[in-house]
Design a protein with these regions (language model features):
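N-terminal ligand-binding lobe of clamshell/alpha-beta domains
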Residues: 1-270
């Protein structure tokens, strides 16, 4: 089986399933999430948001048996992928339950369903343990953002991770919002995990541009950048995102993930 993977979550899932060798093409975002693809000099293609008819020849040169694409899509890009004439599996997860189903779909393509079930059980067990541990700890409100212009709150599966850590998700997951609307909720914690930004969200500049200096999270230094691939790529690396979330909410009970970044609280003049 030769698979063209058009989103990082697909590449990561195949890697977790021990099927990295099936990837015959990927995207630059896949390489950022999984550097081994770069080391292998895997041919690069546009993702399922930017793929165009002009990219069909490059896709066909990689001789895929199957293209696997996932959200986010553009209708024009999906049409161009389908017109290439290669079988396409399209995924659109919203919840953790969707992610489990998608994992099984991918696993069936590479004869790895037993391993997929084991990985799913491990993730579910970890979430159950987190929920049990955090249920007696202080509940807190959390705003988590996947995009800054316009402001878009993170996806429902991330709200589920936050809920497992006894956090209340501010706003509607996956929906567009405004700086003023978030300011009115005055959340305890701010998470930034912008798609494609890795761990490079300029938190201090964002806070200043939105006039959020007065928010509780800013005043107490509880503003964090969580690497994009830990939250926005729906695969088993979500466990690393959960590590970041649990530490941010309950720092005395959970260790700090080395890749999460924190904005310091402002210095108060004496």
């Amino acid at each position: 089986m030769r698979i063209a993977s058009l989103q990082p979550s697909i590449s990561l899932t195949l890697s977790y399933l021990g099927a990295l060798d099936t990837i015959c093409a990927a995207t630059k975002w896949c390489v950022e999430a999984l550097p081994e693809l770069g080391e292998r000099r895997t041919p690069l293609l546009p993702d399922s948001w930017s793929f165009a008819e002009a990219d069909q020849s490059a896709l066909l040169l990689t001789r895929p048996d199957l293209v696997i694409a996932s959200v986010p899509y553009r209708p024009e890009s999906l049409t161009a992928i389908l017109k290439a004439g290669v079988p396409v599996l399209t995924l659109a997860p919203h919840t953790l339950a969707d992610i489990y189903l998608d994992t099984r779909l991918i696993a069936r393509q590479v004869d790895a369903l037993p391993l997929a079930e084991t990985l799913i059980e491990q993730l579910q067990s970890r979430l159950s343990h987190t929920t049990s541990t955090c249920s007696s700890l202080t509940a807190q409100t959390v705003y988590c953002e996947e995009w800054g212009k316009p402001l878009i709150a993170s996806q429902p599966w991330i709200a589920e991770l936050i809920a497992a850590a006894n956090g209340g998700f501010v706003g509607k997951p996956g929906a567009q919002t405004t700086a003023d609307a978030i300011a009115l909720t005055d959340p305890d914690i701010l998470f930034f995990s912008w798609c494609g930004a890795g761990d490079r969200v300029p938190m201090d500049r964002v806070i200043a541009q939105r006039n959020w200096q007065h928010l509780r999270a800013v005043r107490t230094g509880r503003v964090f950048c969580i690497p994009d691939e830990f939250l926005n790529t729906p695969s088993f690396n979500l466990l690393e995102g959960l590590d970041c979330i649990t530490h941010a909410l309950h720092p005395s009970h959970f260790p700090r993930h080395p890749r999460m970044k924190q904005l310091s609280a402002p210095t108060v003049a004496s």
